[in-house]
Amino acid sequence: MQRKEANPFQILGLRPWLVKQLTKLGLKGATPIQQKCIPAILAGQDCIGAAKTGSGKTFAFALPILERLSEEPVSHFALVLTPTHELAYQISEQFLVAGQAMGVRVCVVSGGTDQMVESQKLMQRPHIVVAMPGRLADHLTGCDTFSFDNLKYLVVDEADRMLNGDFDESLSIIERCLPKTRQNLFFSATMKDFIKESSIFPIASDCFEWSQDSDVATVETLDQRYLLCADYDRDMVLIEALRKYREENENANVMIFTNTKKYCQLLSMTLKNMEIDNVCLHGFMRQKERVAALSRFKSNQIRTLIATDVAARGLDIPSVELVMNHMLPRTPKEYIHRVGRTARAGRKGMSISIFRFPRDLELLAAIEEEINTKLTEHPIDQRMVERIFMQVNVTRRESEMQLDNNDFDERAQNYRRKTWIMEGKDPDQMEALYRKKQKDKLREIRRKRKLQHAEPAASEEGKALLQDERFKSVDSARFEKKGKGRSRATQEDTPTKPLKRLNKEKPVAQKGRADVKKDKA
């Protein structure tokens, strides 16, 4: 009689009920970070785990916490800190799914909802609290209706971002309210020295550390590509690349990243006005709107999501086939997080990043050095880009007018002021500082532009990349700024399958008086 092989999760020390639940979820084996970190956490060690995006980091800490919670089901057993609303809700969902058999209670504290409602949920004795630092600090300083006296686990997810200094004030308040005898678990896509040297959360001397060994920071199943554009036709290049991809992959899910909240909203409106259904996700949206947008995308009701970097970290949407960088991330690390939304858990995926030639070559060189991989050029029909130039420009202008009519800038200012007031800061003083920063930023952008116009590739990295075989044959004249006489492709050179609106017949112009007289004659 053939001996039945033990379940991989059972070997790690998890109870049969939890192993059975994981089997129901279709998980056949543990990922490397789960194999290494789960036994260490169950053994009572502090843990620092680093692995690529999509490697199963959430279950690496959620499973051992649920295992121990089933032995001692007390309230406020574990606290998970995370930097974004969306990630907080995703982590809570994974706790609920894995702990369904034991009836685990999870509370999300992330702002965007009524603080009194959150307070009531915290009073209902949840087992797990998943929180953003700022809102949890507000609860801890504003009321004493709950405590973390029973806390056994503190988890800091996306630790490289959480401990970089931006959240220190809130984290210090939280630390003072937590018991000293607990396990500290830190998880991130990258291992950083400052995690071990954190002055806010002390790390035990016997802390277990594990980092995924790889020279390549992105997964092998990810096909990474680039597109070159000029300053004036980035939107056209994006739309044509999206149109072509949709022709071949009609039911694929696509995430498009851009850098600012306003442009995220503007790009979303522009695509909608061109009959490309999409939802957007950015920080100025209400929490209900953000959750609804993400739910529609996750459930495949809408196949295109346009987002800022609030969606770049940690979000697990398994069915994303393509990530597009409409505007490039500011650092190679953020690039890794963005493209990590696709090709997750062994699946294949593609990323297409749009680089302005030659000004973005320095960033391309930095990204390729960081990921130890060369990007390949994505094919695009330049004649089609030329053809839709006018339509996209006009549609974007219409969208800008709609955005101005909706008082987007005024609502953004009100949002900032409300946030500063809640943080106990002087809104007028903070607004003055904000405007000064914006002016300095604009001045720096203009300075860089002057350098780039004076010399196409100002940095040594950019100069070296211009000598790369990929760019030697590039016609730089194509990327120079053109005026009113901008050339457009002729009808004979144009492909026959453009965007939907491009195929619509133009309305017949009404005849003027002169035309009517001619007809009568």
Curated annotation (Swiss-Prot):
Reactions the enzyme catalyzes: ATP + H2O = ADP + phosphate + H(+)
Residues annotated to bind ATP: 51-58
Give the GO biological process terms: regulation of alternative mRNA splicing, via spliceosome; rRNA processing
What molecular functions are annotated in GO for this chain? ATP binding; ATP hydrolysis activity; RNA binding; RNA helicase activity
UniProt-listed CDD domains: DEADc_DDX49, SF2_C_DEAD
EC number(s) from the headed UniProt entry: 3.6.4.13
Q: Specify where the region named Disordered lies, as residue ranges.
A: 448-521
Q: Where is this motif: DEAD box?
A: 157-160
Q: Where is the composition biased (Basic and acidic residues)?
A: 460-482, 502-521
Positions of the Helicase C-terminal domain: 237-386
Task: Tell me the ranges covered by the Helicase ATP-binding domain, including all copies.
Answer: 38-209
Annotated motif Q motif, positions: 7-35
Name a GO CC annotation attached to this entry: nucleus
Q: Which UniProt keywords apply?
A: ATP-binding, Helicase, Hydrolase, Nucleotide-binding, RNA-binding
List, alphabetically, the InterPro entries matched: DEAD/DEAH_box_helicase_dom, DEAD_box_RNA_helicase, Helicase_ATP-bd, Helicase_C-like, P-loop_NTPase, RNA-helicase_DEAD-box_CS, RNA_helicase_DEAD_Q_motif
- Membrane-crossing ranges are none
Q: Which PROSITE patterns match?
A: DEAD_ATP_HELICASE, HELICASE_ATP_BIND_1, HELICASE_CTER, Q_MOTIF
Q: Which PANTHER family match?
A: ATP-DEPENDENT RNA HELICASE, ATP-DEPENDENT RNA HELICASE RHLE-RELATED
Family per record:
Belongs to the DEAD box helicase family. DDX49/DBP8 subfamily.
Q: What does this protein do?
A: Probable ATP-binding RNA helicase.
Name-wise, this protein is Probable ATP-dependent RNA helicase Dbp45A
Q: Which organism is it from?
A: Drosophila melanogaster
Q: What is the lineage of its organism?
A: Eukaryota, Metazoa, Ecdysozoa, Arthropoda, Hexapoda
